[in-house]
Amino acid sequence: MPPPTASTPDDSADPGPDFADVPPTDLVKVGFIFRPHGLDGELKIDPSATDDPARFEVLPTVFVGPHPRRVVRHDIASVRYQKTKRGITVILGLDGIVDRDDAEAVAKMDVFATEAALGLEDDELFADDLVGWTVVTEEGAVQGTVADFMEMPAQDLFVVRTPEDTEAMIPAIDDFIIEIDEEAERIVVRPIDGLMDA
């Protein structure tokens, strides 16, 4: 009987996403992948995490994944825009995502870029930077802390964890947000009846 031979891996098996071993530590969320666009691997991106969708035109590379610590690096191949009822949607082409199946595999994931690539000024903030900040009224009454930031079709929302350990939603618009105090890491809000109701 011949000796047993070592099994070899099946090269045809799908290894899954090639997540970066050591992702950059300065990743900032710049978009969210709605779904594929067409059959050639293009992606529909919600760019509301950045104040300027045109940033994508100057980015050489982005990182795609469910979390900034678990991402895949992609060079940007193409950028164009589409007007929708919700505003501007970015149609993004990425190297390595070449057909609809590839695009489906990354749908509903986030898109990140490094602070260095974005050329952020020292005083520039993204919504994710505000998680953990204190929310207070003009009179200084603590309303809670920012637990999350939600990008919604009508308007973006801050999710606030109240002192009673409930969640409240604050629209991220000028009618509600009076001041964003970076030095104190707090957001000053205008109290409106029902605003902080869970």
Curated annotation (Swiss-Prot):
Nuclease among keywords: no
Keywords: Chaperone, Cytoplasm, Ribosome biogenesis, rRNA processing
Residue ranges occupied by any PRC barrel domain in the UniProt entry: 122-195
Record bears the keyword Cell division: no
Single GO molecular function: ribosome binding
Annotated segments matching region Disordered: 1-21
Localisation: Cytoplasm
GO process annotations (BP): ribosomal small subunit biogenesis; rRNA processing
GO CC annotation terms, alphabetical: cytoplasm; ribosome
Subunit structure, as described in the record: Binds ribosomal protein uS19.
Free-text function comment from the UniProt entry: An accessory protein needed during the final step in the assembly of 30S ribosomal subunit, possibly for assembly of the head region. Essential for efficient processing of 16S rRNA. May be needed both before and after RbfA during the maturation of 16S rRNA. It has affinity for free ribosomal 30S subunits but not for 70S ribosomes.
Family: Belongs to the RimM family.
Recorded domain comment: The PRC barrel domain binds ribosomal protein uS19.
PANTHER family: RIBOSOME MATURATION FACTOR RIMM
Protein name: Ribosome maturation factor RimM
Species assigned in the record: Salinibacter ruber (strain DSM 13855 / M31)
